[in-house]
Amino acid sequence: MKVTILHQKFIRFVYLLDLELIKRKFVLGLSGGQDSLALLKLLCDYRKTYFGLLKLVYCDHRWRLESIANAQRLYYLSEYSNISFYYFATSTFLSSETQSRTWRYKNLLKISLSFEYSYLLTAHTLSDISETTIYRLVRNLRISEINNLLFTFLYIKKTLSISRPLASVTRNDTYWLCSLSYLPLWSDYTNYWLFLSRNRIRQELFPYLKNYFNCSLERYLDGFIYSNKINLITLNIKLKKILSKIFGYTNDGLYFNVSLFKLLPFFYQHILIRDFHFLFFHNYRSPSQFNRLLFAIALEKSQKVFIRKQYHII
């Protein structure tokens, strides 16, 4: 085994594992592309040292005519590596990426929980995370939802977590490892369907931004998400302390301290009202509706206002 920079990064991921879970069971979602094969190569190189049982799972969306041949190639690869192989094929047509992703994770979680596996490994790279960040930014998602993209471990249950061992490497790195190891890559032409939004970002927008604005765009977005995540954690700690002083319970019900709320900066006011509205009424409102509510609170002369479930924003 030739140790490369990707092997060193992978070892850093192994050190993050719970020591009690090392040598246990792992499920790897496989597609046959360069990212998943690079992850399989790293797992096989350190299998005897760190890992116990491995299972490969291939989910066939049946978008391609040769998808069954792709599955057969992966099956032969699993036989060569002495790893169990599971194949799932959809019985209905999946018309969108969202439906395909939901169906794929449903099967991956099903087999992981059924056999009581410790980790579900996916081959998402830093390039995938960066592309998803841009995709969600242009769709005007909340910054907290973007921060959730950057994770190495996502705990589903006490005994199972989804893990991304390649979250710190780019797609160019995985291609280099596959070329160095002569791995049998399978070209997926659905990645070039430009009517899919994510493919258009990957094939057109992302290369344009890297070529003309920032050649290290993945690293920049990685730092952007990380710094925002730290700032958000700090902000949430402050807001929880403020929230406990502004909202409270009495015999008459839940009350809202108007006089103390008015002393806060407008930015804090907006976040407090938005998050409280979601926790209490389980939905989000538009920014214009929240601005009207904040304006109504500014005109309120009472010291405290009791909140009822029947209240609504016009």
Swiss-Prot record:
CDD domains reported in the protein's UniProt record: TilS_N
InterPro entries for the chain: Rossmann-like_a/b/a_fold, TilS/TtcA_N, tRNA_Ile_lys_synt, tRNA_Ile_lys_synt_N
Keyword line: ATP-binding, Chloroplast, Ligase, Nucleotide-binding, Plastid, tRNA processing
Main location: plastid
Name this protein carries in UniProt: tRNA(Ile)-lysidine synthase, chloroplastic
Tagged with keyword Chloroplast: yes
GO terms of biological process kind: tRNA modification
Free-text note on domains in this protein's UniProt record: The N-terminal region contains the highly conserved SGGXDS motif, predicted to be a P-loop motif involved in ATP binding.
GO cellular component: chloroplast
Gene: tilS
Family: Belongs to the tRNA(Ile)-lysidine synthase family.
A Pfam family recorded for this sequence: ATP_bind_3
Gene3D superfamilies noted in UniProt: HUPs
Domain of life according to the entry: Eukaryota
Reaction(s) this enzyme catalyzes, per UniProt: cytidine(34) in tRNA(Ile2) + L-lysine + ATP = lysidine(34) in tRNA(Ile2) + AMP + diphosphate + H(+)
Stated role: Ligates lysine onto the cytidine present at position 34 of the AUA codon-specific tRNA(Ile) that contains the anticodon CAU, in an ATP-dependent manner. Cytidine is converted to lysidine, thus changing the amino acid specificity of the tRNA from methionine to isoleucine.
Listed GO MF terms: ATP binding; tRNA(Ile)-lysidine synthase activity
Its EC number(s): 6.3.4.19
Entry binding sites for ATP: 31-36
Subcellular location field: Plastid, Chloroplast
